[in-house]
């Protein structure tokens, strides 16, 4: 039975892909067969007439995953917009059946699977024939989640609002990870302290431009659940 986790964030460009890559890298360095999946990806680069799934490509390179990164993403769009809008612009109908098929195909290849979301937690994936929100994908695969937040000013508000939404959707949050953390920045220190003191969820940090996570691998293994 495979084990899985979902990586979401308090907003766009917080560092989900960066953190996702470091988590998978950490596990794979300890000989854990960990893979990657993303339902929909925007802002893909076109090379030689082919769209390249940039986020997946980054994760595969950092975590040393073999194979074609495009195979880890169900829907790849060039426009730098939300998946639902990209689908509209390209006349594409996003299907939960295809997402499920691709997810289970990836899942069958790995013992651990790390699923990356799109944007923040409130993200429409499809507003076409099927109405799909990001939380629908999390729940259909029964995945627990990690919330990535920026360490700086405003993160207390955005983190707590994100957690409240996820609680309403009955999504289990296993960890908060403050990205771009500076151990000498008083705001970062205070934010971590406040969240740690007022939440029942463990709060970890990731230093800016870090090549590795400081989180013990045992802690990472613990938060992945059977799926």
From Swiss-Prot:
<feature type="binding site">
    <location>
        <position position="116"/>
    </location>
    <ligand>
        <name>Mg(2+)</name>
    </ligand>
</feature>
<keyword id="KW-0436">Ligase</keyword>
<feature type="binding site">
    <location>
        <position position="17"/>
    </location>
    <ligand>
        <name>Mg(2+)</name>
    </ligand>
</feature>
<feature type="binding site">
    <location>
        <position position="42"/>
    </location>
    <ligand>
        <name>substrate</name>
    </ligand>
</feature>
<dbReference type="GO" id="GO:0009102">
    <property type="term" value="P:biotin biosynthetic process"/>
</dbReference>
<keyword id="KW-0479">Metal-binding</keyword>
<feature type="binding site">
    <location>
        <begin position="179"/>
        <end position="180"/>
    </location>
    <ligand>
        <name>ATP</name>
    </ligand>
</feature>
<comment type="pathway">
    <text>Cofactor biosynthesis; biotin biosynthesis; biotin from 7,8-diaminononanoate: step 1/2.</text>
</comment>
<dbReference type="InterPro" id="IPR004472">
    <property type="entry name" value="DTB_synth_BioD"/>
</dbReference>
<comment type="subunit">
    <text>Homodimer.</text>
</comment>
<dbReference type="InterPro" id="IPR027417">
    <property type="entry name" value="P-loop_NTPase"/>
</dbReference>
<comment type="similarity">
    <text>Belongs to the dethiobiotin synthetase family.</text>
</comment>
<feature type="binding site">
    <location>
        <begin position="116"/>
        <end position="119"/>
    </location>
    <ligand>
        <name>ATP</name>
    </ligand>
</feature>
<dbReference type="GO" id="GO:0005524">
    <property type="term" value="F:ATP binding"/>
</dbReference>
<feature type="active site">
    <location>
        <position position="38"/>
    </location>
</feature>
<feature type="binding site">
    <location>
        <position position="55"/>
    </location>
    <ligand>
        <name>Mg(2+)</name>
    </ligand>
</feature>
<dbReference type="GO" id="GO:0000287">
    <property type="term" value="F:magnesium ion binding"/>
</dbReference>
<dbReference type="GO" id="GO:0004141">
    <property type="term" value="F:dethiobiotin synthase activity"/>
</dbReference>
<comment type="function">
    <text>Catalyzes a mechanistically unusual reaction, the ATP-dependent insertion of CO2 between the N7 and N8 nitrogen atoms of 7,8-diaminopelargonic acid (DAPA, also called 7,8-diammoniononanoate) to form a ureido ring.</text>
</comment>
<feature type="binding site">
    <location>
        <begin position="13"/>
        <end position="18"/>
    </location>
    <ligand>
        <name>ATP</name>
    </ligand>
</feature>
<dbReference type="Pfam" id="PF13500">
    <property type="entry name" value="AAA_26"/>
</dbReference>
<keyword id="KW-0547">Nucleotide-binding</keyword>
<dbReference type="GO" id="GO:0005829">
    <property type="term" value="C:cytosol"/>
</dbReference>
<keyword id="KW-0460">Magnesium</keyword>
<protein>
    <recommendedName>
        <fullName>ATP-dependent dethiobiotin synthetase BioD</fullName>
        <ecNumber>6.3.3.3</ecNumber>
    </recommendedName>
</protein>
<keyword id="KW-0067">ATP-binding</keyword>
<keyword id="KW-0093">Biotin biosynthesis</keyword>
<keyword id="KW-0963">Cytoplasm</keyword>
<feature type="binding site">
    <location>
        <position position="55"/>
    </location>
    <ligand>
        <name>ATP</name>
    </ligand>
</feature>
């Amino acid at each position: 039975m495979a084990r899985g986790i979902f990586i979401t964030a308090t907003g766009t460009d917080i560092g989900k892909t960066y953190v996702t890559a470091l988590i998978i890298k950490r596990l794979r360095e300890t000989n854990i067969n960990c893979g990657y999946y993303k339902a929909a990806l925007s802002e893909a680069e076109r090379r030689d007439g082919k769209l390249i799934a940039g986020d997946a490509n980054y994760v595969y390179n950092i975590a040393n995953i073999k194979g074609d990164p495009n195979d880890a993403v169900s829907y790849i769009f060039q426009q730098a917009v939300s998946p639902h809008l990209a689908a509209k612009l390209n006349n594409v109908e996003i299907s939960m059946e295809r997402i499920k098929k691709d997810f289970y195909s990836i899942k069958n290849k790995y013992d651990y699977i790390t699923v990356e979301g799109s944007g923040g937690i409130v993200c429409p994936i499809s507003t076409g024939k099927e109405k799909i929100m990001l939380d629908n994908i999390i729940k259909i695969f029964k995945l627990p989640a990690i919330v990535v937040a920026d360490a700086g000013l405003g993160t207390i508000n955005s983190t707590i609002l994100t957690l409240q939404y996820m609680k309403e959707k009955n999504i289990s949050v296993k960890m908060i990870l403050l990205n771009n953390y500076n151990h000498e920045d008083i705001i970062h220190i205070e934010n971590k302290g406040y969240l740690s003191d007022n939440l029942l969820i463990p709060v970890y940090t990731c230093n800016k431009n870090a090549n590795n996570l400081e989180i013990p691998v045992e802690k990472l293994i613990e938060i992945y659940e059977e799926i």
